[in-house]
Design a protein with these regions (language model features):
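Catalytic alpha/beta core domains of metabolic enzymes, predominantly
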Residues: 1-54
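Short alpha-helix boundary/capping motifs
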Residues: 31-33, 67, 90-94
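Conserved short secondary-structure transition element at the edge of the structured enzyme core
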Residues: 5-9, 45-80
Length: 100
């Protein structure tokens, strides 16, 4: 997200924002306040989590992240499968510091 802001976009809507909207907003807010250092710190905090949830676990990961933060994610529709217990535990551990 921060790369896009550096290149001049006015905002961003990453898929991970569905799972952790506050954490994503904090990156944007720090950037808009002119605090690039804080924006980088906030981005670094969620980078690995976002990559795992979006790229490795996909839609099922995003939906489970939503459920963790008190939103309705629900089960993915077929042909996508729900996460395994191990995958859910991985997301819970990664998102521990990003819960709303």
């Amino acid at each position: 997200m921060l790369d896009g802001l550096r290149s001049g976009v006015a905002g961003a809507m990453p898929a991970f924002a569905a799972s952790a909207p506050q954490a994503c907003y904090e990156v944007l807010a720090a950037w808009k306040d002119g605090d690039a250092g804080l924006a980088e710190e906030k981005q670094a905090r969620l980078q690995d989590v976002a990559e795992t949830v979006e790229e490795k676990l996909g839609i099922a990961g995003i939906k489970f992240g939503c459920d963790l933060n008190g939103y309705f994610g629900g089960r993915p529709r077929l042909p996508l499968l729900p996460l395994t217990g191990e995958e859910r535990a991985e997301i819970e551990a990664l998102m521990r510091g990003l819960r709303n």
